[in-house]
Amino acid sequence: GEVVFNTAMMGYPESLTDPSYAGQLMTLTYPLVGNYGVPPFTVEKNGIATFMESDKIYASAIIVADYSEQYCHWNAVESLADWLKREHVPGITGIDTRELTKVLREHGLMMSQTMYRKLFTKVSISLTRSAVRR
């Protein structure tokens, strides 16, 4: 899928559940991800989700520099890794996400291929230029 990036310091539950990221590999540039876990999926009386954009993860994968297995937040109900595993979404760590973001900014749209053995294992990403012309 297409590799995209997000420069927000927090809000990965909202970003991952945003339908606009459907099928894309989301690169998070903030250096530490997962340290506040994942909040519960709740809906307000008006029908709007409280901590997420929808009830499922739309991104096809998440790419982070450093994943924190330890999480601590008053509202967290599970770790990011547990949530991704439950939703069958691969997580990739050990990538220089800021350098990857520079490449994406300089070269534009890029497609990727991921190969992994288990959730949050250091792997290689093979980036190729998209056949789509601007």
Give each language-model segment a name.
Residues 1-134:
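RNA-binding accessory domains that recognize and position tRNA/RNA substrates
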